[in-house]
């Protein structure tokens, strides 16, 4: 069963928090509920609040109310992907800062965009290369039980996912995006598909820093609706920019 009630008109008023459910699309399959929400770019107030909370400037395009969530209905266990938590997992030191010719100028332009940080902006990974792999909400389970349901030594059954089973539910959601002051692109997005017996969710951090590096960090979540089993897999790959002939940020379901 699928319900759809997206806010789609460009001039439609931004919903009050109490009305966020009206912009949420859900699908129930067996014991699981899958939810996605897509709303316009966050406004100044929420951006200032988030900047103060996480301690770094946020990207130019942040969709703070967007989310993707997979919930086990009997227990309330949920694995959720949202922009605030994804940005909070960005490195807030200078240990992994990538350098480009205009990095200092770019940082200076971001300092004045928020009211949440009064002092000079602290060092941080301005490429927004988050290590985020989702937010766990245990529901009725203990923290240990919840973690075990999302992390396992078992691998995602690739062969089953290659089958051309009918797709019952599909969606794509962007959580944040930055053009890095015309030095490339950094984007965190999610893409999911649901079949009768299983589903796959791919959340991807894609970074292209022109003439420097290409980086991909993927979190794949596989759900078996017959066994109630959830497998989460995190992978990270990167290569020098000149070694990559063609790159696209768009998530795919390939397992190369």
Predicted segments, located by residue:
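Polyanion-binding and phosphate-handling cores
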Residues: 56-146
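Short, isolated positions in well-ordered beta-strands
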Residues: 34, 39-41, 78-79, 214, ...
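A eukaryote-biased signal for long
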Residues: 123-256
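Anionic, Ser/Thr-rich low-complexity intrinsically disordered regions
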Residues: 4-52, 97-120, 125-127, 145-170
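Amphipathic, interaction-prone secondary-structure segments
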Residues: 45-85, 181, 187-200, 204
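Hydrophobic alpha-helical membrane-spanning segments
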Residues: 6-22, 32, 76-80, 86, ...
């Amino acid at each position: 069963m699928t319900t759809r009630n997206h806010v789609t008109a460009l001039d439609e008023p931004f919903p009050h928090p109490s009305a966020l459910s009206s912009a949420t699309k859900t699908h129930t399959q067996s014991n699981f509920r899958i939810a996605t929400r897509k709303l316009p770019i966050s406004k100044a107030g929420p951006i200032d609040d988030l900047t103060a909370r996480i301690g770094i400037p946020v990207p130019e395009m942040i969709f703070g109310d967007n989310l993707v969530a997979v919930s086990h209905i009997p227990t309330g266990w949920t694995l959720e992907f949202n922009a605030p938590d994804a940005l909070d997992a960005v490195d807030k030191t200078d240990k992994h800062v990538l350098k480009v010719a205009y990095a200092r100028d770019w940082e200076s332009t971001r300092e004045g965009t928020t009211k949440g940080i009064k002092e000079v902006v602290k060092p941080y990974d301005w490429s927004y290369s988050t290590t985020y792999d989702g937010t766990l909400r245990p529901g009725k389970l203990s923290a240990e039980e919840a973690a075990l349901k999302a992390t396992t030594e078992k691998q995602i059954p690739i062969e089953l996912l290659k089958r051309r089973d009918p797709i019952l539910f599909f969606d794509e959601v962007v959580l944040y995006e930055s053009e890095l002051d015309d030095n490339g692109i950094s984007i965190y997005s999610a893409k999911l598909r649901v079949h009768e017996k299983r589903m796959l969710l791919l959340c991807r951090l894609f970074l292209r820093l022109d003439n420097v590096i290409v980086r991909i960090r993927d979190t794949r979540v596989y759900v078996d609706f017959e066994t109630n089993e959830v497998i989460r897999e995190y992978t990270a790959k990167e290569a020098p920019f000149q070694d990559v002939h063609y790159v696209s940020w768009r998530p795919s379901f390939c397992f190369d």
